[in-house]
């Protein structure tokens, strides 16, 4: 009997084998199929209305990319989570004692829910998939370059605080054999500069004013003379116009032009940058930056003796131009017009008169000197030498490799990193010395920053034409994809720390977005 067979384009199921039974049950998305099973199809002659593929083929579908929130329709494939630091509802509820770098915020922005209710909600990512989140952060800062928080407003200095009374108040009349002060006693002081955002020349003025204040507060009352002030910050090159025969600076004055920050020391004095970033602002670094301690002493400046000035009254000029002098009559200038000594002594190596002051700049430029081997001349970093900025979202991301889950402030896993967004802006200002004189005359600043205008060593340091300022710029960083948790609580913690893992008080705006997406299956092998 010729009967019509039901048409079908579905291929027959694979024949069952008795030796290796199928390890995959005839299921679709975990439910029995509406059609006959493979066994019943084979027993009925292979006529099946629906071909059932193995469960592994159908497994990746069926909601494995769903993002669910409450009873709303699931969102497929991806979404975006927003982290904002100054939501009014969050401030009133969770962040009364927080700041922009350590706060909590709700990522559920449902206008029908208050902050308390939104914090109890959660966003569910299908746990059959491995999810990753693309993190993008944006931070704005208002950080000054001199602050106590970043250890850039103080430095330790060693100065004379006591000595025997001088036997005579008259200025010196002859070159000394060496620098020796009867009964001199030294001790360490903490030199602190007011916090602020300064240009380089302003910072040097404040440092020198701090040195004078230390002298006035204790040294002056204990017989310490002005010529015994043994720490000075300067910018000049004291070796310019030094006569190679006499060893004296022939004009009788040092060239009043700034080139690079410098440190001037007397015997027994020192400066300690161990716990200060001011060395970075001054452009004085370490050859071995990871070695412990950073102290510059007078002995470290071997070869940096500041040459003595030529006493113009001691020479007999015999030509019309006034450039040729009688060498036999050349003598060093022993004191300034106010009678303050220049501490002129004889160099033990050359026998020529020099001052007892030593300059770091001069010592650094002597080949193979100790200053050249242990320190490094760098561009002054007026950004404060601040390091890195770390972002942590402990309630969103799974701890990256190398971290463990922790919600402690200084132990939160790091999921984002970038340089601190302060930048050293270099500019050129022509005739900066003229501008300095104009400012001093108009603002009565001479008494504050140029207390010893007659003394060529202690006078105000000239500004540099090439100088620097600190500038804060927004930092927008694409941090990349990291694994996120499958259950995201509505209340999230955001933490932005410095390289010591402390919340940064100078962050005044921080926002972030996380875009989750499926990376792989969490159930398939």
From Swiss-Prot:
Belongs to the adenoviridae penton family. The gene is L2. Residues 8-18 have a biased composition (Pro residues). This is Penton protein. HAMAP family: ADV_CAPSP (MF_04052). Interacts with the fiber protein (via N-terminal tail region). Interacts with the capsid vertex protein; this interaction binds the penton base to neighboring peripentonal hexons. It comes from Fowl adenovirus C serotype 10 (strain SA2). GO terms for biological process: endocytosis involved in viral entry into host cell; virion attachment to host cell. One of its GO terms (cellular component) is host cell nucleus. Coiled coil: none annotated. Pfam families: Adeno_Penton_B.
């Amino acid at each position: 009997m010729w009967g019509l067979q039901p048409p079908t384009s579905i291929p027959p199921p694979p024949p069952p084998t008795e030796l290796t039974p199928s390890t995959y049950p005839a299921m679709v998305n975990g439910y029995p199929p509406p059609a006959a099973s493979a066994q019943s199809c084979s027993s009925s002659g292979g006529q099946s209305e629906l071909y059932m593929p193995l469960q592994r083929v159908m497994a990746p579908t069926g909601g494995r990319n769903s993002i669910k929130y409450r009873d709303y329709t699931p969102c497929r494939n991806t979404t975006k989570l927003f982290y904002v630091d100054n939501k009014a509802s969050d401030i009133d509820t969770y962040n009364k004692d927080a700041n922009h770098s350590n706060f909590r915020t709700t990522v559920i922005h449902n206008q029908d829910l208050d902050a308390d209710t939104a914090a109890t909600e959660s966003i569910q990512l299908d746990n059959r998939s491995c999810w990753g989140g693309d993190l993008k952060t944006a931070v704005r800062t208002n950080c000054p370059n001199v602050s106590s928080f970043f250890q850039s407003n103080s430095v330790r200095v060693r100065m004379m605080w006591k000595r025997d009374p001088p036997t005579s108040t008259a200025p010196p009349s002859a070159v000394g054999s060496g620098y020796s002060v009867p009964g001199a006693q030294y001790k360490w002081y903490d030199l602190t500069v007011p916090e602020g955002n300064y240009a380089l020349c302003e910072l040097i003025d404040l440092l020198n004013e701090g040195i004078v204040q230390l002298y006035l507060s204790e040294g002056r009352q204990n017989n310490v003379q002005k010529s015994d002030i043994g720490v000075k910050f300067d910018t000049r090159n004291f070796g310019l116009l030094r006569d190679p025969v006499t060893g004296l600076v022939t004009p009788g004055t040092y060239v009043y032009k700034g080139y690079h920050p410098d440190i001037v020391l007397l015997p027994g004095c020192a400066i300690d940058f161990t716990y200060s970033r001011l060395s970075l602002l001054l452009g004085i670094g370490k050859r071995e930056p990871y070695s412990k301690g950073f102290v510059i002493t007078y002995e470290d400046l071997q070869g940096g003796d500041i040459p003595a000035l030529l006493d113009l009254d001691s020479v007999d000029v015999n030509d019309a131009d006034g450039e040729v002098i009688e060498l036999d009559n050349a003598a060093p200038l022993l004191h300034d017009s106010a009678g303050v000594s220049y501490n002129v002594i004889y160099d033990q190596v050359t026998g020529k008169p020099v001052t007892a002051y030593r300059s770091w700049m001069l010592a650094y430029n002597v080949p193979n000197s100790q200053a050249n081997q242990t320190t490094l001349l760098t561009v002054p970093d007026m950004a404060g030498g601040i390091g890195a900025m770390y972002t942590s979202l402990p309630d969103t991301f799974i701890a990256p490799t190398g971290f463990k889950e922790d919600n402690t402030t200084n132990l939160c896993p790091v999921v984002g990193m970038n340089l601190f967004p302060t930048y050293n802006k270099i500019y050129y200002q022509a005739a900066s010395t003229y501008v300095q004189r104009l400012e001093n005359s108009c603002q009565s600043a001479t008494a504050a920053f140029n207390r010893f205008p007659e003394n060529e060593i202690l006078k105000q340091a000239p500004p540099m034409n090439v100088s620097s300022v600190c500038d804060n710029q927004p930092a927008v960083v694409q941090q990349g994809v990291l694994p996120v948790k499958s259950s995201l609580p509505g209340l999230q913690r955001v933490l932005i720390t410095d390289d010591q893992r402390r919340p940064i008080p100078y962050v005044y705006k921080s926002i972030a977005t996380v875009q989750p997406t499926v990376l792989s299956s969490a159930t398939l092998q």
